[in-house]
Amino acid sequence: MTAIGAQAYKLLGPKRPHRSFFESFIRTLIIVCTALAVVLSSVSICDGHWLLVEDRLFGLWYFCTISNHSEPHCLRDLSQAQVPGVAVGMGLARSVAAMAVVAAIFGLELLIVSQVCEDVRSRSKWAIGSYLLLVAFILSSGGLLTFIILLKNQITLMGFTLMFWCEFTASFLFFLNATSGLHINSLTRSPPAGTLAYRKQGYDGTSLI
């Protein structure tokens, strides 16, 4: 390609979309909050201790009993908790919650790539990433609801541990970032190519400029 041809391609080829400072700030804030939600959810699931009821500690991975002057005695066999269906149900809850983190990580990656490598597909990547965050919210909420339903007879509001509230906060952030990402993508949608040309002409075909 000659120098003139290369210059013409730069002038006529697709240009990177220009974004305002406010839009860039909002998109960066969504990415940062999503990363925070991924960290909160990951820590919460790895720890897994979500409910403390008197001397019993219920979690995704362990069931623990606590005495006054000794360390917690934890068992991997969740059936020892003597709660119907808790062994199978906790397996489902932690699997769904872990899948939520995976979906959120992929969504976060697409959000970052759409901002770092801006091209004509950046908006599509951002939209897909936002939808993945919505999937992460649904899965994370499913894990929380499964845990609550399994232990509905033992639950007290003050019994929920910090790790449970971390997962709850992460689930809320997944939803907030997903809806915010889709909303800002729709607000900043560029008009079709023919729209601007149509606006420059009158109804009789004469140019307005």
UniProtKB/Swiss-Prot annotation:
Pfam families according to UniProt: TMEM37
Major subcellular location class: membrane
Keyword Transmembrane: yes
Any one GO molecular-function label of the UniProt entry: voltage-gated monoatomic ion channel activity
InterPro entries per the UniProt record, alphabetical: Tmem37
Membrane-protein topology: Multi-pass membrane protein
Keywords, in A-Z order: Calcium, Calcium channel, Calcium transport, Ion channel, Ion transport, Membrane, Transmembrane, Transmembrane helix, Transport, Voltage-gated channel
Transmembrane segments: 25-45, 96-116, 131-151, 155-175
GO cellular component terms given for this protein: monoatomic ion channel complex
Subcellular locations according to the entry: Membrane
Function: Thought to stabilize the calcium channel in an inactivated (closed) state. Modulates calcium current when coexpressed with CACNA1G.
The family this protein is said to belong to: Belongs to the PMP-22/EMP/MP20 family. CACNG subfamily.
Subunit structure: The L-type calcium channel is composed of five subunits: alpha-1, alpha-2/delta, beta and gamma.
Protein name: Voltage-dependent calcium channel gamma-like subunit
Species of the source: Rattus norvegicus
Lineage: Eukaryota, Metazoa, Chordata, Craniata, Vertebrata
